[in-house]
Swiss-Prot record:
Domain of life assignment: Bacteria
Family per similarity comment: Belongs to the UPF0434 family.
Protein name per Swiss-Prot or TrEMBL: UPF0434 protein MADE_1009415
Family annotation (SUPFAM superfamilies): Trm112p-like (SSF158997)
Signal peptide: none
One Gene Ontology CC term in the entry: cytosol
Length: 64
């Protein structure tokens, strides 16, 4: 099941409540402010802070 991009309009980072962006290969939602990546499993984003991956500044910059 693919991630529905329309969800980006209503989903927010669970940490800062900011905007999330879809990464290039459409496997993660990224919060650029907190530098966290949330996996998408079977089309469903896993928006749990303890399951998120911390990103470097270079990795965050690559998600434009």
């Amino acid at each position: 099941m693919a991630f529905d991009k329309k969800l980006l309009e209503v989903l927010a980072c669970p940490v800062c409540k900011g905007k999330l962006v879809l990464n290039e290969d459409m496997t993660q939602l990224v919060c650029r402010f907190d530098r966290l990546a949330f996996d998408i499993k079977d089309g469903i984003p896993v928006l749990i802070e303890s399951k998120a991956t911390a990103l470097s500044l270079d990795e965050v910059d690559a998600t434009r």
